[in-house]
């Protein structure tokens, strides 16, 4: 499981979509590329099930396919990574709204395309993960969310492989002249106990790429897991002055950063500083940029030279 997954997007829940999109574009990091394209059309009946709370209370709706779609999401193209920015009203009514009320804005799910959505979903269910959202058309799953929040407080969302329309849309976004030539590396997930979190995600089918080790520059110990083509870094803060400790104290466990490999780290830092970015930590190997004002997420650049 996960070896043949393709990243679809990182899902950030916010209260102000435009503010989040503007932040990344103003800093020269991301380009607002509009909502995601429609799922492939198939005539028939759709079914939508979702938890009204994080812990349950499911509801089911049925609909005829082909009706109008109210696009609410925005998307920021950051390098070759798509960041979905979805506005929600904090409070009761849907599990994501409750998540937003408890933690504030932030990335709460990672969406992948998989050639075996039914088999992969079954694997998660067998490991005790609840199916908190499931959309089907004529009985076939087109999108779901699985509750993998036990460690790391992040959910996994699965979709079937993208069709040519969506693939072309993504390729066109990446060719925009303002999109940075950044290569998406992965996400950093702050956790209370790196060892326990590692064991949990290995049981879910993630692959261990680097054992737990320390970074004194960041004030953390962390390990690298691989899921699909991306790194899933579990980060346990060890220093009180670490920015990752700040993230943990404010929001608890969860995705704290998005990381990208860049060819010229010094040049990228200079460009971002000229646009008003705040540099938190930098070495010859990486730089940490503070973009928590909208979305509670840091950008980390890795020297790929």
Residue ranges, per PLM feature:
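N-terminal beta-strand motif that seeds the catalytic metal site of vicinal oxygen chelate
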Residues: 1-21, 30-33, 105-112, 162-199, ...
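Accessory recognition modules or surfaces
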Residues: 2-13, 17-20, 27, 33-72, ...
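Vicinal oxygen chelate
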Residues: 7-15, 63-66, 70-82, 84-86, 97-180, 221-226, 231-233, ...
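Conserved active-site tyrosine of GNAT-family acetyltransferases
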Residues: 20-25, 124, 197-202, 272
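Short, solvent-exposed secondary-structure junction/capping segments
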Residues: 29-30, 206
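A cross-kingdom feature marking solvent-exposed beta-strand/loop segments within repeated
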Residues: 36-62, 90-109, 127, 132-143, ...
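Beta-hairpin (beta-strand-turn-beta-strand) motif
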Residues: 81, 88-91, 113-115, 237, ...
